[in-house]
């Protein structure tokens, strides 16, 4: 009897650890696809879409139109969060995560074969917006499921570290998207890049999708979800998203405020600054493409390191530190841009897109999913996360470009915009209770 008990314990521990590892790797693989596709669109919108899909308007208005299509994807993310969250809470996380990767990859590949405005007229931007909406819908269901499955499967004292793979996918996705665009840009003329070169990274998405599907197929459904499904259920159940909104309305506002730092630092450095530095300052596009490579590579290291620190010293402390770094780096970043000082541009880009950004995203999975009950956690965390994407991130490049355009090229309003968002995130984290997010 005793020997049976002693042998079962280690076997259960090993099985749980293997489940946690497969969940972490599967979540990471899908996140790579989603971030690659989403960031690739932002990079290409800054370089190509204004000329390929909106050539009938001025360069400034073409840029605004291109960034507006970037924001369309974010408008559909909450809908994806609601639909995938509903079925994820009812049918399981794994099924939905397989579907989101398929949808994201196919939509991205199709963007790569859309004819230009000169070929099919206004149908070109219509198709672009439609596929961008599909991208947004798919990624809307991705984060909640990936974060939830990795958190629910992780060891109790290592939830930030094991779930950080969802955000490490951001670093790898940024590395791949900027790296491939930079490589093709360096090997083609401007005319070739605008004609067909930009399409290659979109078609490459299919390769990433196949790899992600293989890894996700090996994942197990989380034990916590299986236990919740076996528990007695009330005869009449409200929709999971309604349950989350009714029981935890304040959680949605917290998520929106907390994500401002992450979203503004990411999209101002990776999308807006790329356009601003080339169009307004005359800097070579390779500068911010290479910065994207550097930031993406560093994030693969910094995100898990910061997550380890969060598990050891407290999630809230790490979050506050990152948001304050973003607050203090906003003005110096734009001052470096104006001075065209390459060293300081790179330095403060790292402070914003690596230190500030990575310190806040590394703990979001356990922080946000912990705000909701298990039976409606996919819907609650997923919808809250995606609503925050619309409010705080979807139109960030558009807003920043509009601020510069209507201020005659002055950057101070964008710096204030960035600094304010980071400060709001810092204050929100400070006001949250330690027993929730210590």
Predicted regions and their residues:
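A late C-terminal transmembrane helix in Major Facilitator Superfamily
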Residues: 375-405
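A membrane-interface helix-boundary motif in multi-pass transporters
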Residues: 186-203, 402-420
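Extracytoplasmic gate region of multi-pass secondary transporters
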Residues: 42-43, 249-298, 392-397
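Cytoplasmic membrane-interface "Motif A"-like loop-to-helix N-cap segments
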Residues: 90-101, 312-323
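C-terminal transmembrane helical hairpin of 12-TM major facilitator-type secondary transporters
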Residues: 317-363
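C-terminal ends and interior cores of transmembrane alpha-helices
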Residues: 102-120, 325-340
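Multi-pass alpha-helical transporter architecture, strongest
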Residues: 212-219, 367, 419-438
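Glycine-rich segments within core transmembrane alpha-helices of 12-TM secondary carriers
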Residues: 161-185, 384-396
